[in-house]
């Protein structure tokens, strides 16, 4: 959904089945086979109740991830999906719910569903049941039909987010001509409008054909939604999503929109982030039933249950709106240009990537944002509002939300919101002038505070660790390029001792995620580079230790692009002539000469890499021999 994501995080599952017993979860293999065969027989039966019962059992099996391979292998999707077109409303609803739940498991599951031709009945559902449908207040199945539509829209979203083939089929269908009619809040519920907006938000991004269709079919409806009055979470969510769809219809390049529309959109995003997420979650936790000790929580009943459900829905909508707002902001200030659709490996693209990543001399990343956008970011205090989302509610509040079944989704949303906020901060750091971030001291504080999240909050949370270390790296980059050889700003790090970086070094040693290792290696390298401007016995010792550590890690590294990052980091640190003595002390050129053929061999073995990693490996491979020759010559003259 956003350009800040390297991989798609797992979506939260919504349970269709009311109960999932331990007995079912531990079904023996032969019993499971029998159960699947029974489901297949029921789904292909003629009786409505029989088909409905089969779909309910299907939904219960989906709740246990261990059952998914057998569900896929036995072709349950191929049999269940056509029931989206069943004459019985209850059967369509059960089929939509089960398939939607299955699509949330993993991207690979969506691929398997596509292989079993799930898109044909999904497309037919929209063509046959959604083209002219409006909720009938007098219909007994009104709520059921509305829920079926929402589930089918969510299913479509999940498939398109995971599969390019699904996006292709979507473009060949009439679905994008049908969905805009569901943006009318006068006819359809806010739940339906929200589901459609969420789907469009995803399928329109980087999809020129979809952009054109939605622009011509839904422009007026989307602008109407921008002008909605009120601060209710459901209203803020609709307005935020509408803003995101409008931006995506112009290829992500918000500056092509009229100035008044840009102002309205930026104000909506800022207002959405002005709601205190920690406060509303704390208020909710006061109404959530607590565990009675053995782990059992007695759910409220009657009116109390309705009030709690309403509050949970409201908080969920608010967190969803804030996450969407953050993703939109991250994309606005992303280095990727809206018209850079071709993905050609041209030198100009590589130069742009280098500029965005490193803020090279010449045009700064912050100069690439148009003045009117920069003014909006600063006047609306966007950075502070996004940063606030990196802070979770109090620990006791999080525990209460996690323990109660009804609020577990909110607990997961809070963790996701924190991660997305950090990824957005990463983009904002390269976009905003350092003066508007509190100067060097302000950026240093961001580095310190983010370090607490990365190393102290939850070391097992890989998504948090990756996003937090990316922010720490970006913060040091900001300080480094602001410094430009001026040692004054580096006094912040002049007292840095080995004990201060032990957490980072340990983190690199123990880390199993290449992206996090890369961030940490680059980060300790930037620290060493900052210390080069303030050399003394203590800082020299720290630089040598960091150097030897990176060299040691480079020999152990399996991923060629992380190895290239480590080598590139050392080249950066020792490119200054003041480091010649230190380079001689750690025998840098001899050790890099040993790494050079290793890097070349790995580069030959691991050719299938994302574009930015290919650039990194290519740069390191070509620069290393020249650097070794240059540095060896310098050292020989000492």
Where are these regions (language model features)?
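Alpha-helix N-cap/helix-start positions at coil->helix boundaries
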Residues: 48-49, 65, 89-90, 107, ...
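HEAT-repeat alpha-solenoid elements in large eukaryotic scaffold proteins
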Residues: 2-20, 46-62, 92-103, 146-159, ...
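Long alpha-helical repeat scaffolds
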Residues: 6-9, 38-41, 56-60, 79, ...
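Elongated alpha-helical scaffolds that mediate protein-protein interactions in large eukaryotic proteins
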Residues: 24-34, 42-44, 50-53, 60-78, ...
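Alpha-solenoid helical repeat architecture
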Residues: 43-46, 84-87, 102, 126, ...
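Alpha-solenoid helical repeat scaffolds
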Residues: 22-61, 65-69, 75, 123-128, ...
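Acidic, serine/threonine- and proline-enriched intrinsically disordered linkers and terminal tails
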Residues: 2-31, 132, 266-416
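Alpha-helical scaffold repeats of the Armadillo/HEAT/TPR superfamily
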Residues: 6, 32-35, 72-79, 113-124, ...
